[in-house]
Each structure stands twice: as C-alpha cells, then as structure tokens.
Amino acid sequence: MVQRGVHFFSGVPDSLLKAFCLAIGSNNGGLAHRIASNEGCAVGMAMGHYLSTRTLPVVYMQNSGLGNAINPLCSLATPDVYGIPLLLIIGWRGEVDDSGKQLHDEPQHVMQGRVTLPQLNVLDIPHIVLDGHNTPPWDDIQALLQRAHDEHRPVALVVRKNTFSSPAASANPTAESALMRREAIVAACLNVLPSHLPIVSTTGMLSRELYELREQRGEGHQRDFLTVGGMGLASQIALGLCDAQPQRKVVCLDGDGALLMHMGGLTNTAQASNLIHIVINNGAHDSVGGQPTAASRLPLAPIAAASGYGATYYAETEEALQAALQQALQAQCSQFIEVQCRVGHRSDLGRPATSPAQNRDAFMQFLNTPPQLS
C-alpha cells in the first residue's frame, strides 16, 4: 500500500487487525497514523487528508463499527456527493465461509458478521475478502485501489480471522505501573455499592471481569446489564434507566475508549441526578490489543465537570475510590468518578455462561422487583 502512495491511516483498533495496527503504529517510514474516537471520525479525517494531498487514505475498523461510518460514507464520501477515494480495511468478526456457513463467534458479532458483505453491497462499496489461506492476487488488490482513484469512491478489504500473522508482544509502560488493575477496581466498587443498585457495564473485558467477580463472590448476575456490543452506549442505556426509575440510583461502569467513542453523550448523562458514572481509564483499547486512546494523555474528570456533572472525582487508589463512592451514594446530583488503571487483564479470563437474552430477562425482573435496601 505504501508503494501505491498510501501514507495516512486512521481507525478504531480491532483484534483481527492487531498485527496491522501494530505495524502502522510502530512504522517510522513517514506514515501518518491517528487512532480515531469512532469510525465516522476516521472517515472524516481520511477525507481531509485526501482533499489536502490527493492520495488514498486508509480507514480501518471492526465490522461492528461499520454502522458508525455509514453516515459519512453515504452522505459525504460517495461518488454522488464529494466522491472521495478511500480504502476501508474491515475486520470480519462473525465471518461467513465460502460455503455460506457462519463461523462461531460471540453473540454480539453474529448478526453483524452475517450482514457485513450484503451491507457493503447495499452501500455500493466494491470489496475483496482477504484470508490467510487463499489471499487474492496482489494484482486484484491493486485493481481495487485503482478503481477507488478512477471512480472517486470508497472501496474495502474485508479481513478474515488469521489473515495477519500474530504480532510480537510490545512493552507498555503502564502495564507494570503501581496503578490498580481494572478487575481490582471493579471488585472495590462491588464492596461499596449497595446490592439494590443496578449496574450497566461497558463493552469488553470490564463486563467479563464483572461477571467473573459475581461468580467468585457467589452473587447473582441479575443486577448487572452487560453491554456486550454497541461500544460507547452503556452510559446511554444507564441514562434510560435513570429516567425510567428516578427513585433509585443507577451505576454505569464505563471505559475510556467507550466514553470517547460517543463523548457527546456526557452532556445528556450529566443531567441525570441519580447516575453514578464510573470511568475506568487505562488509556488503552485493552480488549483489542492495548492500542492507546486519547485518554492516555487527557484527564476525563474535568471534561465531565464542563459537561455539567454535579460532582466529579479522580482516584488512583482503592482508598480514594471508596471515598468517592461513599460521597456519590449520598449525593443528589449526577456523579462522575474517573479511576486511573493499569493496562492488562488475566490471560484466563472467561466469558459469561449466560446468554444476552437470559441477562436481559433477569435484569428486567430485578428492575421491577421492589429493592431490598442494604
């Protein structure tokens, strides 16, 4: 791609593209690379690059993020509007093999995996599927890139699992820091939060850790809504609960990457007087490879305060976190707690044994049962 004049890359990291992301992130050959807060923003940056340089930009994403990119692809980059050539590189979770059989994946990837290629067809985006066993000739890929230039349109490479070789482990200075691990932070929250409060947890490792902690503690899962997909929307789900049940406090366990993806939602959640919004900030996309987020150099609590939260806190220790939680539980306005965290998770971390539908039903029953105050 570099030989074809590609020098700009932007997107949201994906586990299937981990080696690719590592390569462009560590390249010292003059490549411009910016990790985007969401996929639509990446398309916007790619457009700006093309308008300035006339060279083909690359936007990378997991297929679950294609929805975030559809608006700028359809209303800006399409040949019907500005006609911006760009290359999408899309990790295909929930992929369908050549025989039409869908490979096993987590529930949140099933529908998106099934509709990824039809979605690109409907969007009129020419595409090629890549895999590690039957890679198309380079001439075909070159022809696709040339088509992007000639027809002034987006094109796509759809990447199956194991297309790229596994990346070498890279050192992360925050991985061995003195900060708490995320799992310990979640455990500390559970030690303080009353059992009658509902918790909405964000996408990725955090929800898996919450589930395992409930198992270890012999507690049920009915009070927790695990937001397994829809990255960045856990806080908005929590806001919906706050509005529907103003008599009870609602807790959102969020992450920095998720918060950044739809950060405009802070101006809405800040208005919920019964919300306790806890953001665990490790400055990384931990679930898909540990690539840095903008929050690695950006304090989030002041942003929350400027967005209208009634009170904000910052914690690096369990003692500071517990003190913030105790104050938040007594407050009568929206509360935002930023907890600094080291990167990393247990290698043996499991996945929920219950289905999303079972989680939904148990959570709804919990919400509609009079709370036993404790």
Can you say where each PLM-predicted feature lies in the sequence?
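A contiguous pocket-lining binding segment that forms or flanks enzyme active sites
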Residues: 276-310, 314
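Low-complexity intrinsically disordered segments
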Residues: 339-346, 350-352
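Active-site regions of oxyanion-processing enzymes, predominantly non-cytosolic
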Residues: 153-158, 333-339
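DG-centered beta-turn motif at the end of beta-strands
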Residues: 61-64, 248-265
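A short, acidic, amphipathic alpha-helical segment used as a generic capping/interface helix at domain edges
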Residues: 142, 146, 317-330
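Active-site flanking residues adjacent to catalytic metal/cofactor-binding acidic residues
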Residues: 159, 253-256, 280, 339
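Thiamine diphosphate
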Residues: 1-121, 125, 129-151, 155-239, ...
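A short alpha/beta connector and helix-capping loop motif
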Residues: 74, 84-86, 262-281
